[in-house]
Amino acid sequence: MTRMSISVKNLKEIVDMLGTIVSEVKFKLEPNGISVTAVDPAHVAMISLDIPKNAFSEYDLDAPDEIAVDLDKVKSVIRLASSNDTIVISKDRDKLRFEIGTIIKSIALLDNNSVTTPRVPQINSDDYVILSKSDLEKGLRAAEDVSDAIRLTLTPESFSAKSTSDSDESEMLLPKDMLKDISCSQPIKSSYPLEYLLKLVKSISSNEDIKISFKSDYPLSIEFSFNSETEPISGKFLLAPRMES
């Protein structure tokens, strides 16, 4: 029988993160852990997560499998738990069974064929910046009431996030000495939809450093991880650029 145990905190973060862009996902179960990739209906944003076996306190798998679920139903289960609880999850034919203390709840699985798993494109760029998640979120929040787009600029000496409208302007400027790492041979800039970017960044609950890679008018890649009991869960956001006239 497929059976696993995971903390409520980590399950909630996984589900909330995926829920920023989709309502249904398909998890791929392998002996070394679980992976999931989702893309929003407009094909603007993509999330990819790798959840290693050691992120679970228990992980028993009869054979490789795929499980498609309605995220809102999983959220309803999570709401029954306390933040320090552990949820035991098992597959029972066409249902997913959750055990939380004295509560047992089952939800119907979706047809695997009804949920597609997108291919993760290769986004290659030698230009990147590593900074704290909180610094990026502050810059995005400052721009929230200015415009629906934000322009990221990377130079060999700094990283900035700027948003402008006819009447207002917001800019976050981080010089090289305030960044954890930077790689840039010549200035690059690209604009992205602010709503998507802020929603994705806010869904990362930890304040670990994140890596942003992009090129001028090119998709944005954000690599991050968040803590589990034993081994970090790693993830990547991809976001299409906002083309400017």
UniProtKB/Swiss-Prot annotation:
GO terms for molecular function: DNA binding; DNA polymerase processivity factor activity. Keywords: DNA replication, DNA-binding. It comes from the Archaea. Disulfide bonds: none annotated. Sliding clamp subunit that acts as a moving platform for DNA processing. Responsible for tethering the catalytic subunit of DNA polymerase and other proteins to DNA during high-speed replication. Homotrimer. The subunits circularize to form a toroid; DNA passes through its center. Replication factor C (RFC) is required to load the toroid on the DNA. Belongs to the PCNA family. NCBIfam families: PRK01115.1-5. This is DNA polymerase sliding clamp. The lineage of its organism: Archaea, Methanobacteriati, Thermoplasmatota, Thermoplasmata, Thermoplasmatales. The gene is pcn.
